[in-house]
């Protein structure tokens, strides 16, 4: 078997008809976790429904439908392999909650794959149409997804087919606008593909002899290749933040007979070990971790990315809840935020937002109403330069620095210290109206909280 491949996460973005599903479906279909039987079943259904041209989007539609219905399908279906990596597609924007997911992200994407359609008139539509394409790329960048690959799709439907001129025109245009957002085009692989026919997906295409391959220049090592799969293989591997202090936002807290209280969540930074004394914020409860489990197996340590359950002593289910954050009591323990300063981008709000606006924030696993206490400055959303001091209101498209105050105790961190706890979605009217990253947190000095007997004992023993 040799060494296990590194796991990486990608997010696929682009306009609604750019062919994201077909392209993604193709990769999953050819390199992925879908077994022969499932594919044959899909093909048979497709034929019966007269969707003989089934190909790949159908695979994805089936998976999506199951995901939407809340059937937890085998997540391996959303995985595929390159020669170096196991790749998981953490989301594709067809989903209703795409933006929210991307922010409260069950996980951070290591790379975004932007699909643009080269077809006549299609590219223009995707880029202008209140530019979903721009919106997604801007979001990816704002939320810290610094690596980008661009797939110029549907090369088979250009005029004439596989037109070099059309491809070059698109590369030029896309380079210009990703540069405005903050990406450096030299570090981005551009690949002309057809997700439908398979051109340059896994094998170099015979239809584009003019394409001499993609090249990227970056300080961590240059790379070149021809296909989309090779470009994915050249993503720089993520550095998982094991050296930071522990932060583990709770997803749930269970009471398990014979064991006791078991909080469950994903380690975002740091390491969780049995015997550690942890503090939960904002409730300010400190206790000892008796054991740590993943998939019903005891672990000697849990690392960033691991979804774990851990048993804590002398803590009742009433003491801690979803949205609380666990950390090491001796190493920068998490604290309640009295307030925080954030940079927000208003995405779609029908009216005007002024000081006093109090929507719900989704930040890590917390879901809490927060007040826009003060609109400090309006800024250029790309460069971050100040445009105006103390604006009276904000509307769609604006970016601003805002002071926020949570309506109930909550624990958040600055994006630069703990990225997963420093980005949030602003929800109102059943949609994401804004996104933000936290610049600074005003932490509440914790009074004497509850320290359990086992924690006192563990601390004495040390």
Swiss-Prot record:
Regulation: Inhibited by plitidepsin, a chemical compound extracted from the ascidian Aplidium albicans. Specifically inhibited by didemnin B, a natural product that triggers ribosome stalling by preventing aminoacyl-tRNA (aa-tRNA) release from EEF1A1 on the ribosome. Specifically inhibited by ternatin-4, a small-molecule inhibitor that triggers ribosome stalling by traping EEF1A1 on the ribosome and preventing aminoacyl-tRNA (aa-tRNA) accommodation. Ribosome stalling by ternatin-4 causes ubiquitination and degradation of EEF1A1.
Region (G3): 91-94
Residue numbers bearing the N,N,N-trimethylglycine modification: 2
Positions bearing the Glycyl lysine isopeptide (Lys-Gly) (interchain with G-Cter in ubiquitin) cross-link: 385
Positions of modified residues (Phosphoserine): 300
Region (G5): 194-196
Residues bearing the modification 5-glutamyl glycerylphosphorylethanolamine: 301, 374
Entries under SUPFAM superfamilies matching the protein: EF-Tu/eEF-1alpha/eIF2-gamma C-terminal domain (SSF50465), P-loop containing nucleoside triphosphate hydrolases (SSF52540), Translation proteins (SSF50447)
Functional note: Translation elongation factor that catalyzes the GTP-dependent binding of aminoacyl-tRNA (aa-tRNA) to the A-site of ribosomes during the elongation phase of protein synthesis. Base pairing between the mRNA codon and the aa-tRNA anticodon promotes GTP hydrolysis, releasing the aa-tRNA from EEF1A1 and allowing its accommodation into the ribosome. The growing protein chain is subsequently transferred from the P-site peptidyl tRNA to the A-site aa-tRNA, extending it by one amino acid through ribosome-catalyzed peptide bond formation. (Microbial infection) Required for the translation of viral proteins and viral replication during human coronavirus SARS-CoV-2 infection.
Protein name: Elongation factor 1-alpha 1
Organism: Homo sapiens
